[in-house]
């Protein structure tokens, strides 16, 4: 697993104090001195967006992009090339057995889109409209990097950094300046209040659940004192945790074989910047948006009235339709 320890803080110039604190804390937890740089998304984004050290940005960018490949950290030990090739072959075999020409047709059969061609047509149309705007914005970043910062040629590891510089120069705003407005406990309080107003529910912490990490919080959803559902909330990035953000079913709402009602349980998982010492985690605006998004999926799963498991909650909903409730 790729990681790097930096002892000279000048090599990390430009990084916000929050990011430096997380890296220092990560090093201390491993009994190391200095700042631990790894490929966890809060660290990666902080370096790519704010760090003045171009060589470090390049090193991190290449390591991140080569994960699980023979050219990545760990070499062939973590190379997934053969696994991916085998997966593609077996998907094609499965599609043929089920009467489809390819796996794309099999996948689309369970979705709203009519065919792979329809999806490609949609993507080409979307790309045709979005690409000119993206190219214009990228051109502005390149001009700004050249004329203001003296960079002749912009590389992939420069994009986020100089986009942030342009945003600061044009609008005098930065995501880091917004973090103090979004302490995690206050964000949860506000999100739960929105849900209370919209759905007439109460959300209460329940410490009786056993969890897999001290960071994990557990809650019950109630209406008029009756428990409707429960969920686990695992917000922060940590070593060996799967990246990204998602909602997963722990248990679906259903009537079991004994005729008893089973209430749903959800897992809401993110990889946000964690707390530093005794202080609460300060979320970025994008992390707040992500949290609301995943909570939307969770509400879809947990507030269902359907008691037949295959069509309860998110089950039986096409994957290209299931994102609608997540826009909560």
Which functions belong to the PLM regions below?
Residues 2-38, 85-86, 90, 96-274, ...:
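Active-site-proximal, well-structured secondary-structure segments within enzyme catalytic domains
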Residues 35, 41, 60, 69-70, ...:
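Substrate/cofactor-recognition hotspot
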Residues 36-37, 48-50, 59, 100:
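Propeptide (latency) domains of metzincin metalloproteases
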Residues 41, 49-54, 218, 237:
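His/Glu-rich zincin catalytic helix
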Residues 50-71, 110:
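Short, charge-rich amphipathic alpha-helices with coiled-coil/heptad character
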Residues 76, 80, 180, 184, ...:
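Alpha-helix N-cap/helix-initiation motif
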Residues 92-99, 195, 274-302, 326:
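Active-site recognition of the HExxH zinc-binding catalytic motif
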Residues 290, 298-328:
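Zinc-dependent metallopeptidase catalytic helix centered on the HExxH motif
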